[in-house]
Amino acid sequence: MTNNYVRFWGVRGSYPAPFKTHMVYGGNTPCVEIRLGKELVIFDAGTGIIPLGNQLMAQDEIRHVHIVLSHYHWDHIQGLPYFVPAFVPGWKINIYGPAESPGGLAHQIAQQMKAPYFPVEVETWLADISYHTPGAKPFDAGAAKLQAFPVHHPGITFGYRLEFGGKTVVYAPDNELQFINQSIDDRKAEFDDEEKALLEAMKEEQHLKGIAFMANADMVIHDAQYTPADYKRKRGWGHSCYIDTIDSAIDAGADSLCLFSHDPNYNDVTLDEIAALADAQVESRETDLACYLAREDMTISFDSDRMLPE
C-alpha cells in the first residue's frame, strides 16, 4: 500500500454507534488519518482516534503528529483523553483548532479532562504538546499545507483544505450548506416579483460563496448527516442533507465526494439505501463526480490519478 493515503477511523456524527446493525460502516465518531510518508495529520479526535493511537504505539514508526480539530463538540474531541501517545514521553503532538474562549485552544482541551468529568487532567500528558489557532493565512502541518475556513455550524467551527503532492483534500465534517437559502425560500411568498428576483440573486451569491472552499478539490469529505426528510425536521442544527452536499460538490467542480458524519440512527441498511440514492442524484446531474459513503478502515491513495476507495 502507498505511504500517502487517507484512512477513516471514525465516520459517525453526534455520538458513537457500536451496534451490530452499524458495523459495515462503523460506529466511531469522526477521525480521519492523513498519512504522508513518515508524517501524520489527523482530522478530529472523536472515538476513532483511540484505535488509531493504539496502532501508532504498536507500529512505533511515527513520533510526531498533527491533530487538526474542526471544533469542540463532544463527538469531535471525546477520543482525545484516550489517545495513548499523549501520555508517552518522546512524542510531539501539535494540536490545531479554533479559539472559542478567552483561554484559547489549550483551555478548550483542558476543560474536558477536568474533574468531575475525567479522572486525570492534561498535566498527566507526557508528550511534548503545542497548541495552534489557525488564522486567515495557510499554515504548514509537516509536508502538508492547510487552510482553515469558517463553516455554518453552531459555535466557531472550521473546515480545512489540505494540499499535498499536487492533490487537494477538503475536510468539512459539520457544515449546513443551504440554511440561508432554505430560509429565503420559506419566505418567498411575502415578496413581489422584483424582490423575488433580488432574493434569487442573493441565493446564487450565497451558494457560490458557500461552496468556494471545495472548488476543484480532488477529494471532498463533507457532512451529509441527513436524508431530505430528516433535514426538514432538523434544519438549523448545523448539518447538511446528502442531496445538498452532492449538488454543492458538483457545482464546485470537485472530482470526488466522500459523504461523511453519518447519523448514528442510520443502520447499514439505511446507509446502503442512501448510497443508492446518492448515485441516482449524481446520475441525474449528468456529471462524472465520484461519490461514495465513508466507512471505517476505508483507504484512499494520494498517488492514484483519482482519489477513490481502494
Question: Whereabouts are the PLM-identified features?
Answer:
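Conserved beta-strand hairpin/beta-sheet module of binuclear metal-dependent hydrolase folds
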Residues: T2-D60, F158-Q178
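A short helix->loop->beta-strand "cap" motif at the edges of active sites that frequently abuts
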Residues: G90-I93, A252-L257, T287-L289
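Active-site neighborhood of phospho(di)ester-bond hydrolases with catalytic His/Asp-centered motifs
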Residues: I42-G46, V65-H73, G97, V170-P173, ...
